[in-house]
Amino acid sequence: MNGAKKNNSQRLQILTQEEIAELYGAPQFNLMERSHYFLLPEKVLHSLKIMKTNGRNTSARLWFILQYGYFKAKHQFFNISYGDAKEDVTFIMAHYLPNDPLPNQLPSRRIQGKLKSQILQWMEYSDDMSRADQLVAEKVRHFASITHGLTEIFSEVINYLESKKIVLPGYARLQDVIG
């Protein structure tokens, strides 16, 4: 991580573009990682009620498994199309939905919201951003008395949020709270 500096929008630039992409970008799994991250616990698999063919529910089930695996890996949700995650989608379809055609579109935003809530429950995480802001502000005050290194503070904040099982806030939000 580099030293912090102000960019044109007056936000502190704490991370490089590469570091931001690594932290906030969707995972890029190899085959072994797919086998691990898309492996669903029996209780989660049972709750999905996957049938021999799933009709209109195929997209919701596919999206759930995709986001479940990504969340398991990075504790965040991703706005990603099936085309952008082609290898992961192919893997999921082959392992969980082999008799269904690939859906043409993602589930509706309303259904995505419900599925995100289910994933958060299964993983015992919270996406309460006002609580995250409060915790981050407390941690920043604490670490600012120990160090002036913004990248070190940023790393500690991320570790702290993960230990509290809170979804990682967006980079701009963390920049604003840390800055």
Give the positions of each predicted feature.
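Long amphipathic alpha-helical coiled-coil/heptad-repeat bundle
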Residues: 2-179
